[in-house]
Amino acid sequence: MLGRAGRPQFDTVGEGIIITQYSELQYYLSLLNQQLPIESQFVSRLADNLNAEIVLGTIRNRDEAVTWLGYTYLYVRMLRSPALYSVSPDYTVDDPFLEQKRADIAHSAAVLLEKAGLLRYDRRTGLFTTNELARIAAHYYLTHTSMGTYHKHLKSTSSAIELLRIFSYSDEFKHQIVRQDEKLEIGKLRERVPIPIKEGIDEPSAKINALLQTWISQLSLEGYALSADMVYVTQSASRILRALVEICVVRGYARTTRYALDLAKMTERRQWGSMTPLRQFPGVAPDLIRRLERKEFPWARLRDLEPNEMGELIGIPRAGRLLHRLVFQFPHLDLQAYFQPLTRSLLQVHLTITPDFEWDDRIHGGAQSFWLLVEDVDGEVILFYDQFVLLRRYATDEHTVSFTVELTDPLPPNYYISLLSDRWLHSEVRLPISFKHLILPDKFAPPTPLLDLQPQPLSVLGAEAASLYAFDRMNKIQTQAFHALYETDESVLLGAPVGAGKTFCAELALWRLWNTGGGRAVCILPYASMVQPRVLAWKARFPTKETVALASETSTNLRLLEQADVVVATPEQWDVLSRRWRQRRNVQSVALYIFDDLHLLSDAYVGPTYEVVGSRARFVAAQTERPTRYIGLTAPLANATDVAGWLGATQTLSFAPSARPVPMEVHIQPFNVPHFPSLMIAMAKPAYLAIMEY
């Protein structure tokens, strides 16, 4: 759009320049000379803009897309010139605001995105479900046509030859043509570039392919028009190739990812992979580079040589120290992996990454980025991926990355963990992790089925106890656990979802304790912030019983323990108090232990102390031969049988996560923003819209 050129309040004339195709020249002249209204061109990029809004979370369904279209200039022009925008009279009869027309436009754009593999579109409800490919398209400014091309042609077996061909098919180059006077030079370039080009010189894709390889090879061009086209191609090359890298990673194509990443780095560095990595350092003498490349000495083995040996290798003794410094400034990482199976199909890996190179701000900048890939035994499938960013201030520290990865059945002999530099060619380390001596856990028992029982009335607790509660019947989970908790003295492990009423189940065990002779009970909560609310709630619930929270001093805690009926504490507090259990009879006389949120046994901070406290409680009971009951309350567990065995629970009620008193509807919206403040901003609006809707 050409606005008013010059300074209208001072000048009488102004100049503006429009660069366009010759076929469009008369159109722009008519706009200026006849002062026609500027028409909207939004329809041509509607699908791509809709995709960007969906990825942002602004638009989640067709109705929101209709509302969004109402804010556009396209909508204004459709109201003013309906015939020009194919708005038939049928739309305007009972719909002055063109809601149906906008719905049809949104529907058409959604169908285009769905065909390109960027969207799942439910035509009945109008719901849009985005994916990683849509995010890549939006972040790299790729059209849905280009993404459809990549979706169609990109395979797990694609080689560098095929990747260059796919690159040349991009919609960004649709206006590129092969001129008659360019054919001879393109033919010469096809013979000079290292990667073969299948297409003939008359096809635009061959021209695009040849120009990209010419750019990497740093070859000179003769034609001015061809040089201009190469600038256009190379300006988009890095962006498109980086998008191809992410597409391959998301799809799990291990080998194709390596090819695409190498092509992207070759384009940015303007050197081929067969050249020495020394070319990536600025200001290195060309003679030094040529001598090193003629030797064909493996780059990785240079780290084993001393400066004088490097000088002898290239035939320039005085350059040995310079070469040694450059070799040890080249990004290199050491890896160590520790792994253990969580289940028969899930492996937890703790990866220790140690930088082993000299950091130079002029060369490495403020940070270096690496791709972390876990590949299968054949190196064909990416099982896990992430990005590791090494900051300058942590360049000498060890870094630990923890992640989980799927274990396939049958168990493969090994996996491969790779770290590939995002910017440096040949900066890669690969670590095999062998499963030869890996011992898998037993298969887990199925969850306890939720029975369709008649709800148990609270009157079974007695009139006095029932009057303390605001409800008169138990839910299904409480009803099924009632017999084990209230009518027996057996230890019980109860696993149920959040909101299932597990605290009431703990209170059933307390009522059982006091109805059968009394005794002291201890409730262990994982976090200190949970203690005081529980104490206040139980003081109101059991006014005749003394409920206390432990303090920070041992002497005070001993006095509280002596006078308390119920003690509420964290694992750390009870650990300190119970260590000298042989000298403390009040610790020995505990008749009931309630371990809440027992699933946090696997937590890195709470878990070890929690496990020690539970094990010591059982040890004390075994040594003193006092009857002690243990109640474990937890979220649904896969290995509930193992936890019950550790706790000494003779009855295990481990319900599935879906066994909820109140059904829960789950909506998953992924976010892939590594920067935490940016992630919070990106999640704010979708979270607000979800709260307002549900």
Predicted regions: what they are:
Residues Q21-E24, S615, R629-Y694:
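Conserved interdomain linker/interface between the two RecA-like ATPase lobes of SF2 helicase motors
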Residues E53-I54, V93-D94, L98-R102, H107-L288, ...:
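C-terminal helical accessory/scaffold domains
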Residues T448-G495:
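Conserved pre-motif I regulatory segment
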Residues P571-D575, R582-T624:
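SF2 helicase catalytic motif II
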Residues T503-F504, G519-A540, D575, A635-A640:
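Conserved Walker A/P-loop ATP-binding site and its immediately adjacent core
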Residues W511-P533, V620-P627:
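Conserved SF1/SF2 helicase motif Ia
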Residues L2-L32:
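Conserved segment of the helicase C-terminal RecA-like domain
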Residues H483-T488, T503-G517, S615-V620:
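Walker A/P-loop NTP-binding motif
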